[in-house]
Amino acid sequence: MFRRPVVQVLRQFVRHESEVASSLVLERSLNRVQLLGRVGQDPVMRQVEGKNPDTIFSLATNEMWRSGENETYQMGDVSQKTTWHRISVFRPGLRDVAYQYVKKGSRIYVEGKVDYGEYTDKNNVRRQATTIIADNIIFLSDQIKEKP
């Protein structure tokens, strides 16, 4: 009774059908990143031979905390750690908007996924790179406002 609908569902989720489709365990996974920070450099449009162009820029996120001896940490020193993220935009419409409107110092929100890759540098050394592949960018403000 339920076998036919189950097989149909499995075929929708599994790209390569096999004879053991009925023994497959269907599980979901999630690769999702949300970043809120400031742009560290103006974006660069890059075209790698044989691949679609992409827009690349860096985004800084800050983690701040108070440390001190008292329990509430109200009077302690403020510490900050800045983490830099490499953002790549491949989607054609979003790629062009990011290239045109993302500017150094802009505060933006980025949604995307983490991608780990390897490349060979100009000295023929293999390097690993972590990149955030952006699916959505929300512009929150212009560049940092000058204080009077």
Curated annotation (Swiss-Prot):
Modified positions (N6-succinyllysine) in chain numbering: 122
Transit peptide: 1-16
Phosphoserine: residues carrying this PTM: 67, 79
MF-aspect GO terms: chromatin binding; enzyme activator activity; single-stranded DNA binding
Subcellular location, record wording: Mitochondrion; Mitochondrion matrix, Mitochondrion nucleoid
Annotated disulfide bonds: none
A biological process term (GO) from this entry: positive regulation of mitochondrial DNA replication
One Pfam family hit: SSB
The UniProt record lists the keyword Transit peptide: yes
UniProt entry keywords in alphabetical sequence: Acetylation, DNA replication, DNA-binding, Mitochondrion, Mitochondrion nucleoid, Phosphoprotein, Transit peptide
SSB domain boundaries: 30-141
This protein's GO CC annotations: mitochondrial nucleoid; mitochondrion
Modified residues (N6-acetyllysine): 113
Quaternary structure, from the entry: Homotetramer. Interacts with MPG/AAG, through inhibition of its glycosylase activity it potentially prevents formation of DNA breaks in ssDNA, ensuring that base removal primarily occurs in dsDNA. Interacts with POLDIP2. Interacts with PRIMPOL.
Function: Binds preferentially and cooperatively to pyrimidine rich single-stranded DNA (ss-DNA). In vitro, required to maintain the copy number of mitochondrial DNA (mtDNA) and plays a crucial role during mtDNA replication by stimulating the activity of the replisome components POLG and TWNK at the replication fork. Promotes the activity of the gamma complex polymerase POLG, largely by organizing the template DNA and eliminating secondary structures to favor ss-DNA conformations that facilitate POLG activity. In addition it is able to promote the 5'-3' unwinding activity of the mtDNA helicase TWNK.
Protein name: Single-stranded DNA-binding protein, mitochondrial
